[in-house]
């Protein structure tokens, strides 16, 4: 008896169904993952099991929403990059101005324009509601406050210069400390004011100064003695008198340690100058721009920020 081998081939087709009511778009539809696969039972035909074709249902979606989201993300990235560029340009323009004292009128105009552009991109519209950003020590980099210029001027006290002006905010205790540090050949000293602040609006705080503090001088307690000094081209050997110089150095170190260990001098501030207000117009983790009485502007950089080391 002859044996006949029956070979049957079935084609498998995929049908894509799109609702006729779908909105007509100019771009081809974006296909999302298969939502369902319909399985039909096996059908027996003449003893041969036949599996019907599978029907895949694929949902089409408009690309408009996805495109809008991508566009918004690109614009946000560009905005951040522009803000960082403005910050760097501002810091670069402050170089050599001695906190504003030595700035020319052209440089002041350039700085003012950069400040205005940054203020328009303020990422923290309500600074007093973001106290964690305000908290910490801020170093003054620039000001237009003319009453501060006499302090910055060199030559008032010979060999003494303003080394640093800072403002430290403690948002937990609502306190502010303004400090000026002076540096000279023999050491450093500081004068500071302690104040309390109250929040008056999302951008404005009222400051009430309570106390002034004159810090204890931090004198240099060590002097490096060279092996020789050169006077008018002639080298003078100091080894024969090194013992005498060492004795003088020890005495100076003892005096310096005694003075530096004394407590600071505190004093009360006059009531008529004990209040002020401060408006923060730009704030992020690196830079703070504030405006005070009379429209004066202050640019401060957070301690530890890489912007302090251009």
Curated annotation (Swiss-Prot):
Phosphothreonine modified-residue sites: 61
Which Pfam families does the protein's record reference? PAP_fibrillin
Q: Where is the transit peptide?
A: 1-59
Arranged from A to Z, the UniProt key words for this protein are: Chloroplast, Coiled coil, Phosphoprotein, Plastid, Transit peptide
- InterPro entries per the record? PAP, PAP/fibrillin_dom
Superkingdom of this protein's organism: Eukaryota
- Write out the annotated subcellular location: Plastid, Chloroplast, Plastoglobule
| GO cellular component terms given for this protein | chloroplast; chloroplast thylakoid; chloroplast thylakoid membrane; cytosol; mitochondrion; plastid; plastoglobule; thylakoid
Its primary localisation, in coarse terms, equals plastid
Q: Per the database entry, which stretches of residues form a coiled coil?
A: 65-94
Cited function? Probably involved in light/cold stress-related jasmonate (JA) biosynthesis.
Q: Which family does it belong to?
A: Belongs to the PAP/fibrillin family.
Additional detail: Simultaneous down-regulation of PAP1, PAP2 and PAP3 leads to impaired long-term acclimation to environmental constraint, namely photooxidative stress imposed by high light combined with cold.
Quote the protein name from its UniProt record.
Probable plastid-lipid-associated protein 2, chloroplastic
Species the sequence originates in: Arabidopsis thaliana (Mouse-ear cress)
Supply the gene name. PAP2
């Amino acid at each position: 008896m002859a044996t006949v081998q029956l070979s049957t081939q079935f084609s498998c087709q995929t049908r894509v169904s799109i609702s006729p009511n779908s909105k007509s778009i100019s771009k081809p539809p974006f296909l999302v993952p298969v939502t369902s696969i319909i399985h039909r039972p096996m059908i027996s035909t003449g003893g041969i099991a036949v599996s019907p074709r599978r029907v895949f249902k694929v949902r089409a979606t408009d690309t408009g929403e996805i495109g809008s989201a991508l566009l918004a993300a690109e614009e946000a990235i560009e905005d951040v990059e522009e803000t960082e560029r403005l910050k760097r340009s501002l810091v670069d323009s402050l170089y050599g101005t001695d906190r504003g004292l030595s700035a020319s009128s052209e440089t002041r105009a350039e700085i003012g324009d950069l400040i205005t552009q940054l203020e328009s991109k303020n990422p923290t519209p309500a600074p007093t509601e973001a106290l964690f950003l305000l908290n910490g020590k801020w170093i003054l980099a620039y000001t237009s406050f003319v009453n501060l210029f006499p302090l910055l001027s060199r030559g008032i006290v010979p060999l003494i210069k303003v080394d640093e002006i800072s403002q430290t905010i403690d948002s937990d205790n609502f306190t502010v400390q303004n400090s000026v540090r002076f540096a000279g050949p023999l050491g450093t000293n500081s004068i500071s004011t302690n104040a309390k602040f109250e929040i008056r609006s999302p951008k404005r705080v009222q400051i009430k100064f309570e106390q002034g503090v004159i810090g204890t001088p931090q004198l240099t307690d060590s002097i490096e003695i060279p092996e020789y000094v050169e006077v008018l081209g002639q080298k003078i050997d100091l080894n024969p008198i090194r013992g005498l110089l060492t004795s003088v150095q020890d005495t100076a170190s003892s005096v310096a340690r005694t003075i530096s260990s004394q407590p600071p001098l505190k004093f009360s501030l006059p009531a008529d100058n004990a209040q002020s207000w401060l408006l923060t117009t730009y704030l992020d983790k690196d830079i703070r721009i504030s405006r005070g009485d009379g429209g004066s502007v202050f640019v401060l950089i957070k301690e530890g920020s890489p912007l302090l080391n251009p």
